Amino acid sequence: TEVLVQTVVHELDSGADCRVLDLCAGSGCIGLAAAANLPNARVLLGELDDEALKICRQNIRRNDLTGRVVSLQLDAREKPPTHLGEFDCIVSNPPYIPDGDIAGLDVSVRDYEPHLALKGGADGLDFYRDITRLWTAALRVGGRLLFEVGIGQADEVLRIMRSVGFGDLEITPDLNGIPR
């Protein structure tokens, strides 16, 4: 996730006004870190889960970013509301664990993380398909769609993105050298 934040900051001009959407925001850490490093960015934390949204709002206040960061209940698997407008960057670390793998997760994850934040469909790629297909319409011309992907999913996510017309794609390894 650190590398994803670095990529967002690198892709956007730190001095320019820009709009960033952190979709499937969870606690909001990606969007909040982007806002902290991009002083002219306006960031929307989009999250479906009510409890996660409460945490997003607390984190916005704790980080003193209430003037530039807002949170909103959004479903990444549905078409974006038109009133949101367009974004320079949509970033997402969506649920990517195949549904059948949930039972085998470490207890510290399986029993304490909301399954809504983990379950990515039969192959773990449902959110990538939906976000790429539906949310591209909310990107400005030349905008960036950035994902964190599960281990072993990078090539398939690239294929999904190419299938809707994305070019100039790259995979960045995480701090352990794993394509994410």
Can you say where each PLM-predicted feature lies in the sequence?
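Conserved Class I SAM-dependent methyltransferase catalytic core
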Residues: 122-180
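Mobile active-site "lid"/loop adjacent to the S-adenosyl-L-methionine
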Residues: 96-126
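Conserved SAM/SAH cofactor-binding pocket of Class I
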Residues: 2-104
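Alpha/beta-hydrolase-fold catalytic nucleophile elbow
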Residues: 93, 112, 148
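Class I S-adenosylmethionine-dependent transferase superfamily signal
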Residues: 8, 34, 109, 131-135
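Structural signal for short hydrophobic segments within the conserved structured cores
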Residues: 70-72, 116, 170
